[in-house]
């Protein structure tokens, strides 16, 4: 299923430890039998996330490209996306039938956003472990990403976070934009994320 516009490019951002790599693993394992997929991971000085996905057998290693960004991680997904664009071009040449490319950013702050030249859809992951105040802090990634994923809901009792407060704050700052509460380590909420990608990425129409 090859789109005339090329593969759907999905940017996945979020702070360190929020669950970006776990989200990539879940999406790859959930969708790889229906779609031709690949992933680009960004780390500052290593290719750790790429190695993790390979070790988890989320997808064949030749479909994983690790990018070492150096410096500030959000520069490589917005101001100067050349390293990521080169990785995408490499994957497109190697796998001409690609339907989806995931682009996982390095750990970043709440202001980081993807260049529209790099990502067609943006998913932003935050963790309940960061505290219930995170949604109301706002920031472009929280307020304007195509889908906000509030992950690690299972940790709420241990960090004193009220999930109802987080939902209410999220609905206020996102002004109708979609969000989902997840516990990706247990795959809870994963189906909602997949359904969002298929609908908003036009995959269901193209199938």
Swiss-Prot record:
Facilitates the functional incorporation of the urease nickel metallocenter. This process requires GTP hydrolysis, probably effectuated by UreG. Homodimer. UreD, UreF and UreG form a complex that acts as a GTP-hydrolysis-dependent molecular chaperone, activating the urease apoprotein by helping to assemble the nickel containing metallocenter of UreC. The UreE protein probably delivers the nickel. Keywords: Chaperone, Cytoplasm, GTP-binding, Nickel insertion, Nucleotide-binding. One of its GO terms (cellular component) is cytoplasm. This is Urease accessory protein UreG. Its main location: cytoplasm. CDD domains: UreG. Belongs to the SIMIBI class G3E GTPase family. UreG subfamily. GO terms for molecular function: GTP binding; GTPase activity; nickel cation binding. It comes from Chelativorans sp. (strain BNC1). PANTHER family: UREASE ACCESSORY PROTEIN G. It is found in: Cytoplasm. GTP binds at residues 14-21. One of its GO terms (biological process) is urea catabolic process.
């Amino acid at each position: 299923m090859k789109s005339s516009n090329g593969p759907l490019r999905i940017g996945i951002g979020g702070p360190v430890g929020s669950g970006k790599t776990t989200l990539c693993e879940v999406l790859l394992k959930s969708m790889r039998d229906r779609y031709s997929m690949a992933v680009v991971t960004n780390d500052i000085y290593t290719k750790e996330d790429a190695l993790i996905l390979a070790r988890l057998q989320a997808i064949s290693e030749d479909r994983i490209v690790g990018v070492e960004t150096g410096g500030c991680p959000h520069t490589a997904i917005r101001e100067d996306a050349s390293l990521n664009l080169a990785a995408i071009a490499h994957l497109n040449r190697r796998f001409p039938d690609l339907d989806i490319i995931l682009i996982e950013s390095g750990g970043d702050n709440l202001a980081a956003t993807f260049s529209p030249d790099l990502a067609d859809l943006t998913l932003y992951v935050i963790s309940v472990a960061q505290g219930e105040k995170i949604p109301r802090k706002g920031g472009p990634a929280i307020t304007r990403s195509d889908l906000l994923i509030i992950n690690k809901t299972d940790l709420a009792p241990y960090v004193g976070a009220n999930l109802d407060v987080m939902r209410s704050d999220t609905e206020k700052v996102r002004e109708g934009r979609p969000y989902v509460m997840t516990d990706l380590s247990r795959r809870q909420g994963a189906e909602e994320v997949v359904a969002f990608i298929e609908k908003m990425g036009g995959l269901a129409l193209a199938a």
